[in-house]
Amino acid sequence: MVSLELALHFCMNAGRFSTMDDQQKQPLALLGNTGLLNLPKTAFLSSRKVSPEAVLRCCAWAAAQRDAGRCVISGFHSALERDVLRLLLKGVQPVVLVLARRLYSPQTLEREHADLKRALDDGRLLLVSTSSAGRANASSTIQRNRFIVDQADEIVVGSLSPAGSLAPLIARADESGKRITRLDSNPDSSRTL
């Protein structure tokens, strides 16, 4: 477990986005096991629209990550991402949940997110807030997704809409040499970008 002093140092210094304009940089807010940031992490991102076949592949992938104990980082915001989170929380592997809004209050965690509270208490969850906004918006969502991609060692894409906000981010990650796996492709032509 990382010390509180180191976590605060991360928030004040290293926790600023290197990929954004100065006006968009904000310190991070962290709750949970900050040591998870030191683990190899696989990002899971998905557009809202997804085929039933891709949903099945994503659920199988999530179960495999859970069973292997791999750390997954995501915003877990789209319906598919929330399904993946539910599967992951049934295991004991580490999870980093990145919010595009301010952190949940302790009362909200207790009342509405008992599964997250249990994972926090077990030391296998880190909540990261990349925005102080009360609700996620288009700008804070892009900011969150950039943070996820920057923190990840590899990226798994459940579904990618060519016109969506994820497409340019995934293209940029591909250009930077990150390993990207698409689960929404035909299994016979499934490829790693």
Task: Say what each PLM segment does.
Residues V2-A7, A14:
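Acidic, Ala/Val/Gly-enriched low-complexity intrinsically disordered segments
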